[in-house]
């Protein structure tokens, strides 16, 4: 029992030492560091807004070959699917009946002409009346007209190509009877160079474009506004550039769209009528567009686009955005970001609004090559 005060003093000393040691450790613990984020400084850029519209190709000219006289087809003088020239003979219809009609018309003309000349001499001698001479002269004129008609009918037994182009399959073979005025075409010729591309644009897109042009948000694309590029079904770009020809003046009630027609050179006949394509049209120029990298744009629970930016105090701010479309790897921002804003694209998972951060240049975003970097970008997303 004599050692109890000594033990108590020893325990107190150890506890005091432990307490002092803990205080020193707490004082030595470093303060929490601000998280590191990568940012992109928003700069206005100029770009040409393009619209990619679906459409189909159609022949520049189409001619259905039909007979203009009745008869039996003796020969087909073309190869199906080949190129034919205007005026080239395609079919030969049996000319026998028309040759006989022509010979008869020639003989009739000789007879009426001879009678008219003889009456002309006799009328001077008052051997015939003026009425008889007029009747003879009228018969001569009728005979001349009959001769011309017979010559035309005989010429029509040679069925000629009305236009140059590619001819399709023949609907009639040798030995088939054809007639003037029949509804079925003997063959169809289509001119493929140049070729039309008919595309459709919704009235909503058309109205928005007009409002943007009127408000000054977009400027007209200039002299090249009517130029059109074509994307084929396999995703390749057609090497020839076309030109916008016209726009329909009425809206299709069933689809709510307007038809636009473009004309493309087609020397190699790469484009065939009926092909499905996409046409890229230049709509307008935005000289001060705000483009934000997609890495810096997220969605909230409602699906609305948002972004985190670093303010002048190096603190994180939440911005609500209005993004109209994508341009390559960027979003076109209409509201929510301004020139000079520092948009966070790296370290988003480590920060929240109001937190102070350390800022460095982002490494996950390529710097824009220049003010016209987005000129060739495709507008491939609909308005939010």
From Swiss-Prot:
GO terms for molecular function: transmembrane transporter activity. A lipid is attached at residue 23 (N-palmitoyl cysteine). It is found in: Cell inner membrane. The keyword Glycoprotein does not apply. Residues 115-155 form a coiled coil. Residues 368-378 have a biased composition (Low complexity). A lipid is attached at residue 23 (S-diacylglycerol cysteine). SUPFAM superfamilies: HlyD-like secretion proteins. Residues 1-22 form the signal peptide. Residues 362-384 are annotated as: Disordered. GO terms for cellular component: plasma membrane. Keywords: Antibiotic resistance, Cell inner membrane, Cell membrane, Coiled coil, Lipoprotein, Membrane, Palmitate, Signal, Transport. It holds the Pfam family CusB_dom_1. One of its GO terms (biological process) is response to antibiotic. Belongs to the membrane fusion protein (MFP) (TC 8.A.1) family. PANTHER family: ACRA/E-RELATED COMPONENT OF DRUG EFFLUX TRANSPORTER, MULTIDRUG EFFLUX PUMP SUBUNIT ACRA-RELATED. The periplasmic linker protein component of an organic solvent and antibiotic efflux pump; confers resistance to toluene, hexane, p-xylene, ampicillin, penicillin G, erythromycin, novobiocin and tetracycline. This is Multidrug/solvent efflux pump periplasmic linker protein MepA.
């Amino acid at each position: 029992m004599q050692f109890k005060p000594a033990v108590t003093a020893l325990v107190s000393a150890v506890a005091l030492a432990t307490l002092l040691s803990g205080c020193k450790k707490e004082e030595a613990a470093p303060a929490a560091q601000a998280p590191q984020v990568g940012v992109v400084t928003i700069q206005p850029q100029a770009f040409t807004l393009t619209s990619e519209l679906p459409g189909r190709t159609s022949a520049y000219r189409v001619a259905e070959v039909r007979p203009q006289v009745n008869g039996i087809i003796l020969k087909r003088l073309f190869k199906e699917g080949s190129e034919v020239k205007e005026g080239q003979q395609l079919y030969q219809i049996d000319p026998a009946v028309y040759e006989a009609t022509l010979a008869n018309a020639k003989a009739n003309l000789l007879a009426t002409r001879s009678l008219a000349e003889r009456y002309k001499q006799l009328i001077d001698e008052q051997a015939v009346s003026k009425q008889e001479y007029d009747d003879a002269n009228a018969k001569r004129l009728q005979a001349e007209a009959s001769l011309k008609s017979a010559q035309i009918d005989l010429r029509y037994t040679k069925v000629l190509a009305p236009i140059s182009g590619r001819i399709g399959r023949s609907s009639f073979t040798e030995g088939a009877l054809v007639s003037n005025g029949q509804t079925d075409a003997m063959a169809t010729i289509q001119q493929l160079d140049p070729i039309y591309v008919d595309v459709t644009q919704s009235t909503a897109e058309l109205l928005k474009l007009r409002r943007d042009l009127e408000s000054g948000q977009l400027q007209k694309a200039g002299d090249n506004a009517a130029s059109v590029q074509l994307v084929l079904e396999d995703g390749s770009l057609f090497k020839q550039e076309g030109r916008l020809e016209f726009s329909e003046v009425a809206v299709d009630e069933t689809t709510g769209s307007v038809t636009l027609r473009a004309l493309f050179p087609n020397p190699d006949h790469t484009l065939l009528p009926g092909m499905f394509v996409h046409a890229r049209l230049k709509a307008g120029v935005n000289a001060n567009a705000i483009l934000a990298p997609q890495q810096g744009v997220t969605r909230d629970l409602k699906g609305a686009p948002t972004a985190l930016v670093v303010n002048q105090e190096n603190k994180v701010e939440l911005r609500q955005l209005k993004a109209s479309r994508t341009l390559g790897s960027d979003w076109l921002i209409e509201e929510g970001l301004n020139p000079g804003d520092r948009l966070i694209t790296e370290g988003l998972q480590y920060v929240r609004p109001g937190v102070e951060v350390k800022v460095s240049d982002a490494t996950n975003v390529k710097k824009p090559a220049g003010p016209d970097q987005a000129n060739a970008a495709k507008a491939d997303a609909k308005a939010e």
